[in-house]
């Protein structure tokens, strides 16, 4: 161990500078210089070695928080997963909540074969979705809530264009009207547009590739920048750094059931994404719901 290291250790132990200087055979000025240096350094002993780190300050900062939910597919939602997500929303108090498409399933107007055992009327789907939106507004009375159009929200419109084009342009048959979005102060965003939050572009998405993270990489290659997408029911985060900085790509997961009748053992994960912004710094956290349980910072949410 070097002489300076021994002096630092004695200082850390609380010995007086004069006695340390006398025992070490150095000037008191040298000991005082080392003591001043220790005020602005973090020194961790590692046997014969030392590591010096910059001083750190922890300060609470005002922040903006967005939470993104997608692919709930009401009425085929997982009741426990959705209950846990709403409970977390109540505690997290986001400034922005994005319902990022496929919130309602619209199965009766879909082009795929229907399972008679799962058949439910379109009005029942809309009624249950309206009840969910009312619950969100009650839970987050001051939060900005935005609903982006997914491919399932497009089903009714496409059905009308195919089967009853004369009715397709009727405002009362728009999803905004059918779901009472204005009443619940929820802003509607078309699928051709996106929600902006800090550096992020949030949209339902359309690129589908196998494997976690590959779909969002495809979106980032097409559009660039940081993005959040739904659509594929997977949880994944990737980071790409180029000459413009570091960009985040987020696949948002789902809150629907994980055992649909039309596919076996899907590569899906239940959960949602939280983005915090403060002082130009980005924090992305994905919350994975497992069997109706969510663990965040030591708090276990169970439904």
Model-found features: residue ranges?
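Short, solvent-exposed alpha-helical "recognition" segments
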Residues: 29-51
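Mobile, glycine- and charge-enriched loop segments
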Residues: 48-79, 196-198
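Short, amphipathic alpha-helical "recognition" segments used to contact nucleic acids or chromatin
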Residues: 1-15
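Active-site-proximal loop/helix segment associated with metal-binding centers of metalloenzymes
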Residues: 163-201, 254
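Conserved beta-sheet core of the metallophosphoesterase superfamily
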Residues: 200-294
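Core catalytic region of metal-dependent phosphoesterases/phosphodiesterases
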Residues: 69, 74-181
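Short alpha-helical "recognition helix" segments of helix-turn-helix
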Residues: 19-22
